[in-house]
């Protein structure tokens, strides 16, 4: 019996030693673009980031309602952004409740998915090509809607009349913007307010189709 038990243990040791890469998996921070756009769950995760950025409750300003930034209500969280806004903390260079950076980050997630997450490289259903096609059509529609949503959020906060009296919109993000491109501030011009609205409506129409 001892010989049998010893043989089993020895065989097990050889089994594990022979498979060095059995548990050789990648941790999250080692996953690159080539992995992201091959694995359907990871690809969809990029798009879902744009969903996660949407406020899901009315008191989304650091647990405060936006009314706390006016005379309608008062907050006792003096370190919050709405308190700073109420106390006159808004300047041309600092908006305590601004969503500029966050919204454009969300748009980058959407555009990255539109450019990479709908190709033949990623399969959302490996057994039925027709189902895979339908899933991609649905995800494409969601992407266009999310792009319209985030442009609308930016337009609400930053669109309006300029010094010359013309109604201006916001810089349109119709593609993935790299860090190098983002550093070229002169490349991003504000179109007219109507042009921004037209862009949003066009994306909504694409989402419907």
Positions of PLM-derived features:
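Conserved, well-structured interaction surfaces
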Residues: 44, 80-160, 186-196, 206-209
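Sec-dependent signal peptide recognition
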Residues: 2-9
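Substrate-binding clefts and substrate-entry loops adjacent to catalytic sites
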Residues: 178-188
């Amino acid at each position: 019996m001892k010989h049998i038990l010893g043989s089993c243990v020895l065989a097990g040791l050889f089994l594990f030693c022979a498979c060095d890469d059995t548990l050789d998996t990648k941790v999250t921070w080692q996953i690159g673009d080539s992995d992201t756009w091959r694995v359907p769950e990871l690809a969809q995760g990029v798009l879902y980031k744009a969903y996660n950025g949407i406020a899901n409750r009315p008191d989304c300003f650091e647990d405060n309602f936006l009314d706390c930034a006016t005379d309608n209500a008062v907050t006792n969280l003096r370190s919050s952004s709405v308190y700073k806004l109420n106390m006159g903390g808004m300047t041309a260079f600092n908006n305590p409740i601004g969503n500029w950076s966050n919204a454009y980050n969300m748009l980058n997630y959407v555009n990255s998915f539109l450019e990479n997450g709908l190709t033949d490289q990623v399969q959302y259903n490996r057994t039925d090509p027709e189902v895979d096609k339908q899933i991609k059509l649905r995800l494409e529609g969601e992407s266009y809607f999310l792009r319209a949503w985030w442009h609308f959020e930016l337009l609400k906060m930053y669109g309006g009349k300029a010094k010359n009296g013309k109604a201006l919109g916001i810089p349109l993000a119709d593609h993935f913007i790299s860090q190098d491109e983002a550093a070229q501030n002169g490349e991003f011009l504000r179109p007219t307010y109507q042009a921004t609205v037209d862009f949003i409506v066009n994306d909504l129409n694409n989402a419907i189709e």
